[in-house]
Amino acid sequence: VRGAADLPAARRGGIVSGMCANYTPVTDFERMKLFFAVMRGDPVPEETWPGYGAPFVRQARDADGHRREAATGLFGLIPHWSKDLAIGRHTYNARSETVHEKPSFRDAWRHGRRCIVPAESIFEPNWESGRAVRWRIRRRDGAPMGIAGLWGAWRGPDGRELLSFTMLTINADGHPLMQRFHKPDDEKRMVAILEEPDFDRWLDAPHARMRDFLVRCPAESLEAEPAPRQPPSRQRASVA
């Protein structure tokens, strides 16, 4: 899994195209346990980009029924038919309107491989000054975000299995906060942020109800501020 030092220069500067390509994962063990009811032991970078390893929460089955478990996967879903990992540079977000038909995502959607991506904050470019300025967006109440996502498993030529995940996005045209990000003429998008009471409902929902959870988070529940990128860390995360 690549680290920040391997990123292209434009990405090291903190601005990338696309929707949510950069976020801060939840790294604190107690916050993972408190807000997501899972234990996680893998180290992760302080910021995540496509191709990095980061935690996600999925449903597991044991003798007592369903439960949540934390796993570590690549940010950017790798479909089982892909020949290599490069496709993950383009599959870190899945549009909710077309996720059921796009080859990269339709199997995960059809088979209900839903997950929750724990994030302290996400980063988006604000163009109000005439140039892209990176801003941090987070929950106003101090809780981490639980972002609706899909996960998949990919087996490489060496037989090793790698997990990966993507964030689901929805239209945000007219959203009081999210309309401030990306270029003025771009369609406005936002990740689908789940409320805590909906975590298990999202993971357990019948297939026909999956889209019921992909709704806009109210602007009053979020806050945003400029957050210029710091010099990159060389920390790497493993998904082995």
List PLM regions with ranges:
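Short linear sequence motif anchored by a di-proline
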Residues: 2-240
